[in-house]
Amino acid sequence: MDTSLLEAIQRYVQLEEARKPFLLCQLTKMLQFVLANLAPMRRYQIVDLIKGLVRNRVRVKQTEFQQYEILNRLSKALRESASNNYWNGYSAAICLSHDIDYEMGHAFVPNMAEINLDHGVKASFNFLTGWDYEIDHEVVSSLVEQGFEIGLHGHTHDIALGCRRRSRIEKDLRNSLDFITRYAVSGFRAPALSIGDNLLAVLSRLGFTYDSSFSGVDRYTGVVSFCLPFRFTAFGMWEIPLSIQDTYFFRDRNLSDTDALEEAISIMDAIVAMGGVAVINCHPCIVKNHLEFYRGVLSYIAKQNRVWNPCLIDLVLFLKNRSDANVQGHENWGCNTSLQ
């Protein structure tokens, strides 16, 4: 895939992010301040209510994938990569991640890992280091031994993290350095997908290899905008765009397990057909009440013979090797090559 196309995609993403108004960032900061002083369960309920209000007011303008010249080029390149088995000998890739937001989710992590193992599907578990649960290091060590990747979701679940000053972000994330070092963490998912230049700069300075916070699929229509990893040359980091979140189906739209699974498969089918990378994020605190949906997603992934299922870091290491980049020390970054 040519460098000019990847640079064009990067410019497109930056333009899309630049459209977020300044006032929205300030309102988000104020909301985070209020939420930070609430009990965890009350906080969760209020966030749920706010998302419901937004859902009822939003009017979605559907956008076709072919409308943008950049995306036309991307679509063509993706189809070529699919026919050439670009992704480590496979025509497409599907990566699974789990953001651990609350204590109820943290408690369900061992069960979730067991379900993943039953289906032979790899995943990345992203933890908060200073939120409303105390990390069980025996559980995390067990995840590593079983072949899962450990990532960082932040120190606290600061939904305005990407809007804050660089010094504030660095101070916050440095609280997680012991965890980062202990588990050789290389990947990040921003709380509430709150990403920005300041956050990316801090992540790069702290030695992160990739971020997966940009959304590449419309949460209401399922229209795929982009599904290809790209590199931020200014930060020396990779971005693996997020395709699906369980929150889109259950918190934002209140779908049944059956309807949610149907939409998830439709999105994955579209990305696989284009030869792209689908990233599915499922929260343990949500999945525990939607196991029919979750097992359906895992079954779909397990049955895809032409699709690669790496941990996110292993996908990035493949891309770094593919571009002849320097990957010194990669043995310590990746998750195990096979699930036990």
Describe each region flagged by the PLM.
Residues 169-180:
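An active-site-proximal "capping" alpha-helix that borders the catalytic cofactor pocket
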Residues 147-155, 207-223, 231-233:
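Acidic, His- and aromatic-enriched active-site or binding-groove loops in soluble protein domains
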Residues 1-135, 182, 197-206, 217, ...:
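Terminal accessory/targeting
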Residues 137-139, 162-170, 199-203:
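Metal-dependent catalytic neighborhoods of phosphoester/phosphodiester hydrolases
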Residues 143-148, 178-184, 301-306:
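Structural recognition of alpha->loop->beta junctions
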Residues 186-196:
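Conserved strand-turn element in the central/C-terminal portion of the radical SAM core barrel
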Residues 158-163, 249-251:
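A short acidic, helix-capping loop that chelates divalent metal ions and anchors anionic groups
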Residues 124-126, 151, 189, 209-211, ...:
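Structural detector of well-ordered beta-strand residues that form the stable sheet scaffold
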